[in-house]
């Protein structure tokens, strides 16, 4: 595939350590539409359960020092999806691994990535999800951000500025709990909620939403946000 395209290398539900190619400007409000990244991409099946995905991502204005090569191998072993990811830049290297599976009625996942180069750090996410009341879903994820700081006073004086400017890290602390749930109350009504807890400074973010379709042309949406 040649041209602008969506590119996701992550597998965690909320924060994926290997999703580092950002096709939008972090300084502006995030929007539903994201234009994609300019890339040359090759995908090939290696059988019924395996494939390789590799390519080149163009940096700003095609600058070689800001461009990157990537490779990803995906397979399935005894019902568990496995993925190994490699990203190479002139100044950085990322090696990642992810596993997704199930235990009974619960979904399980784990993903980790090691960045080395001018800055070195680990990032990892592990989580579980499941269903309730026929139409409801819930999830719980723990995230470790090795690029962050445990001391609040150092949030804006981080030792890993490139993690935020190049690799799309946006959380400032190191340890987080993320949870969420959603439910379809009827064919036209749904609710959802998500919470993020910072275990280092005990701050938190909570959001909830309500959606109801009144007709093909009209709908009602309401949201609630809280930072503590």
Name the predicted role of every residue range.
Residues 1, 40-44, 71-75, 97-101, ...:
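Residues on the lipid-exposed face of transmembrane beta-strands in outer-membrane beta-barrel proteins
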Residues 1, 49-52, 77-84, 105-109, ...:
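Repeated loop/turn-to-beta-strand initiation elements of outer-membrane beta-barrel proteins
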Residues 1-51, 57:
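Outer membrane beta-barrel
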Residues 4-8, 56-60, 77, 86-90, ...:
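Transmembrane beta-strands of outer-membrane beta-barrel pores
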Residues 13-19, 63-70, 95-97, 119-125, ...:
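Outer-membrane beta-barrel translocator domains and adjoining extracellular loop/strand segments
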Residues 25-28, 58-59, 69-70, 115, ...:
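Extracellular loop and loop/strand-boundary signature of outer-membrane beta-barrel proteins
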Residues 34-38, 65-69, 76-78, 91-95, ...:
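Residues that define the transmembrane beta-barrel architecture of outer-membrane proteins
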Residues 98, 107-184, 192-195:
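Extracellular/periplasmic loop regions
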């Amino acid at each position: 595939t040649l041209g602008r395209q969506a590119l996701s290398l992550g597998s965690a539900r909320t924060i994926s350590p290997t999703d580092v190619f950002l096709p939008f400007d972090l300084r502006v409000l995030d929007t539903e539409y994201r234009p994609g990244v300019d890339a040359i991409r090759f995908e090939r099946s290696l059988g019924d359960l395996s494939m390789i995905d590799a390519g080149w991502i163009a940096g700003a204005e095609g600058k070689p020092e800001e461009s990157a090569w990537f490779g990803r191998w995906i397979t399935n072993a005894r019902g568990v999806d496995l993925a190994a990811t490699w990203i190479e830049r002139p100044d950085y290297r990322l090696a990642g691994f992810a596993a997704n599976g199930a235990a009974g009625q619960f979904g399980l996942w784990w993903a980790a990535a090691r960045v080395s180069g001018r800055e070195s750090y680990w990032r990892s996410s592990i989580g579980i999800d499941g269903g309730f009341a026929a139409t409801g879903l819930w999830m719980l994820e723990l995230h470790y951000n090795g690029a962050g700081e445990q001391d609040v006073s150092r949030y804006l004086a981080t030792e890993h500025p490139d993690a935020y400017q190049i690799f799309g890290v946006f959380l400032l602390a190191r340890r987080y709990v993320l949870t969420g749930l959603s439910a379809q109350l009827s064919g036209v009504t749904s609710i959802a909620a998500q919470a993020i807890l910072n275990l280092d400074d005990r701050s938190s973010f909570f959001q909830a939403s309500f959606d109801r379709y009144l007709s093909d042309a009209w709908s009602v949406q309401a949201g609630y946000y809280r930072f503590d």
